Curated annotation (Swiss-Prot):
Record EC number: 5.2.1.8
Comment field on protein domains: Consists of 3 domains; the N-terminus binds the ribosome, the middle domain has PPIase activity, while the C-terminus has intrinsic chaperone activity on its own.
UniProt-recorded name of the protein: Trigger factor
Domain PPIase FKBP-type, chain residue ranges per copy: 163-248
Natural source organism: Mesomycoplasma hyopneumoniae (strain 232)
Length: 465
């Protein structure tokens, strides 16, 4: 007997079946015989103990599990014949045992299906796509970053200022007790980089070399070591050295030394930096919009998630986590010691993140379905070429290592974001498109332009290292 039932609250199709009792009995007997072959009794050669005598030494649970393992592929195949296209099954099932004894087996298969989703009015979100307008101050800041990146650091004997790189010692206390990871010597820090928790670097400003001082901070609520979250701490600090940045001088010769195509004078550099800043602002606006738009939509919609999908996503996150630890050569035990986490804490975090990622993926998929957003072959090939260029691999290598579906999903998601921007923006459509174009782009090909911009970004990032 087979019974189908759709479970909308968990986005699953349940197919319950009663196995043929004769077949189940046969598999149970085979399992008994396999387990009996492992029994050793005095007077019998190994594997030759009669089943009647071996039964007394068998683990009934092990026999049932083996019998089920052998029978399961056939049962799953039988259940699958009762699936129709309109069920929208998207993954293989998990199963539950309803009833099982030596003579009878009832089992149910739970297939993840595409969930029922009722989206809010995503065409009129409160979240709007807005590009920050460029000011003269923005261009001056870009120039200053570039000059500082090309400058040099010299030791000075004066109080600490914003922008200095200091070498210092520190020791942290919580409730007047030292804590793990709260101590360091000869540590280099650029003041203003926000590398430490809020308030720490600001209190270093004004301190002098060789003098000790106390700094008081509060660990943030989301601090990675959760046992320190929201805790007040005192740091005893001592400045060893102070280095001041002496920026390079902005001249036409300096600009020429950057070797940026079609940029040889100060005025050309300013135009170039303006174009670069525009593109950065667009990218930043897209990132902010995507985050806030998904949050707004997500708060207004419930997306039922099948347990199998959640488990698979947790497994993926766990694999990424352990791979990262391995790359950084950090044993799991050491990580747990440093962060004060338990393995259950980590699993719980993965579960929350898995549900969030799955929910967002279905929101993307539903909007794509409603708007008819389907990647073209040209978009696929262009995406593969970009991945190849970014990773330094060939197009063929990318095609072989990154699945077709994964690339299609990435393209579709970007099309969804573009469509949401089209619906929810504070800038005219043509302005959004034209922001990506400028005089320099017309004069130089796309590849060279990207290389130039990456060069500028790298120069600007040097100062933060």
């Amino acid at each position: 007997m087979i019974k189908r039932e759709f479970l909308p609250e968990s986005a699953e199709l349940k197919i319950k079946l009663t196995a043929d009792s004769k077949k189940w009995a046969e598999f149970y007997q085979k399992a008994e015989q396999k387990q009996a072959a492992k029994v050793s009794l005095r007077g019998f050669r190994k594997g030759k103990v009669p089943l009647e005598k071996a039964r007394a030494y068998l683990n009934p649970q092990a026999v049932f599990e083996l019998a089920l393992r052998m029978f399961l592929p056939e049962l799953e195949k039988q259940a699958a014949t009762n699936i129709i296209d309109s069920d929208n099954v998207i993954e293989s099932p998990i199963f539950n045992i309803v009833n099982m004894d030596k003579n009878n087996l009832e089992i149910e298969f739970l297939y993840p299906v595409y969930p029922e989703i009722k989206l809010p009015d995503y065409k009129n979100l409160k979240t709007k796509f807005a590009i920050k307008k460029i000011t003269k101050e923005d261009i001056e800041l870009q120039k200053q970053k570039l000059l500082e990146a090309k400058g040099r650091f010299i030791e000075v004997n004066r109080p600490v200022k914003i922008g200095d790189v200091i070498n210092f010692n520190f020791k942290g206390f919580i409730d007047d007790e030292p804590f793990d990871g709260g101590e360091g010597e000869n540590f280099d820090l650029r003041i203003g980089s926000n590398s430490f928790i809020a308030g720490f670097e600001e209190q270093l400003v004004g301190l002098e070399i060789k003098k000790e001082a106390d700094i008081y901070v509060t660990f943030p609520e989301n601090y990675q070591v959760h046992t320190y979250a929201n805790k007040k701490a005192r740091f005893r600090v001592k400045i060893n050295k102070i280095k001041e940045n002496q920026p390079a001088k902005l001249t036409n010769e300096f600009v020429a030394s950057l070797k940026i195509q079609n940029v040889e004078t100060i005025s050309q550099l300013e135009v170039y930096l303006e174009n670069l800043t525009e593109r950065e602002n667009i990218e930043r606006a897209k990132i902010d919009f995507q985050k806030n738009a998904l949050t707004e939509i997500g708060e207004q919609v419930e997306v039922p998630l099948a347990k199998k999908l959640i488990n698979l996503e947790i497994e993926r996150l766990n694999e990424v986590f352990h791979s990262t630890l391995k790359q950084q050569e950090i044993p799991l035990k050491e990580y747990l010691k440093i962060t004060k986490f338990t393995e259950k804490d980590i699993y719980d975090q993965f579960e929350v993140e898995a549900k969030k990622l799955l929910k967002n993926s279905f929101i993307f998929a539903e909007i794509a379905k409603l708007e008819g957003l389907v990647p073209t072959q040209q978009e696929y090939e262009s995406h593969v070429e970009k991945l190849a260029k970014f990773t330094g691999k060939s197009v063929q290598e990318i095609s072989e290592t990154v699945s077709y579906n994964e690339i299609q999903i990435n393209i579709t998601n970007q099309k969804v974001i573009d469509k949401l921007i089209e619906f929810n923006h504070e800038t005219k459509d043509e302005e959004i498109v034209n922001k990506n174009q400028n005089d320099n782009e017309i004069e130089q090909d796309k590849e060279q332009k990207d290389n130039n911009e990456e060069k500028i970004k790298q120069e600007n990032n040097l100062e933060n290292k």
